[in-house]
């Protein structure tokens, strides 16, 4: 029985020009109707940053050119069964993501 913790990644995508963050609206699946950031589970034999780039590609329909990936936090649950790595990626311009089936909308927002 594998007792390794489940690990996930997530990233805030921040537009430095408009000072807004990209959020995605979940589709009619798990957590339907909730807003969140790009992210997901780290697959077996995948490194953290590989997983992050894969999730960006899957959820936004493309990659971010020459991303500057800034680690923010590594959260570990009290029981150690779950680890979540959080990052921020600054971009120069807002863009329109090509959403996959996991999401039905997006918005760029300030945190105020």
Residue ranges and their predicted role:
Residues 63-73:
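A short coil-to-beta-strand element that immediately follows conserved catalytic motifs
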Residues 1-21:
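Conserved N-terminal beta-strand and adjoining loop/helix that marks the start
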Residues 6, 17, 73-96, 107-111:
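Active-site-adjacent beta-strand/loop module that shapes the phosphate/pyrophosphate-binding cleft
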Residues 7-9, 31, 83-85, 102:
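Residues that flank catalytic or metal-binding motifs in active/ligand-binding sites
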Residues 19-59:
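Conserved Nudix-box catalytic region and its N-terminal flanking loop in Nudix hydrolases
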Residues 96-102:
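Short, charged, solvent-exposed linker or helix-capping segments at domain edges/interfaces
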